[in-house]
């Protein structure tokens, strides 16, 4: 099981975004069933309240970077996402299904009871890279609050040969007063020289774009642009 303040899934057919407000969080559980079991047959009980998993979030059937959502199919493995208040406000929680139940581990309940926190985010990327060389996006996340927290972001790309495409999602758990850095690289093809592409990084409280021009490929060792005698 995992605890996340937001989840990442499609918000359009060709882009991803984060879902979840400051006073919300998600409990994510991967399940495998031997017979048909509807998502609504699963319940989470905590603090006298009963919660059912979200059957749909955004426009997608998958949660980045976890995997496909669970639907009622015999022998299927997938993820269910319970939308819960943040903090949970309960010292225990139980996941139940027809014929069984499981008490959540203490570490999971502790994570669900964390207070919301705030992050300062800095995004850097080169202005240009040679074709066939990696362009690295660097995201620095500083936890400016008083509680440990998980930062969630989503990365999309436009160009050089696609109009819009999801790249990946990131989750960083950062202690109060600490800073962590996440990096992601994309390597343009040699035939993309002269074009450009854009990283679009989004999170709950903001978004940043970085356009990167693509230069001619660098010459490999031993190659020369002119003959000599």
Language-model segments: residues:
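Conserved functional micro-motifs across diverse proteins
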Residues: 1-152, 161-181, 185-229
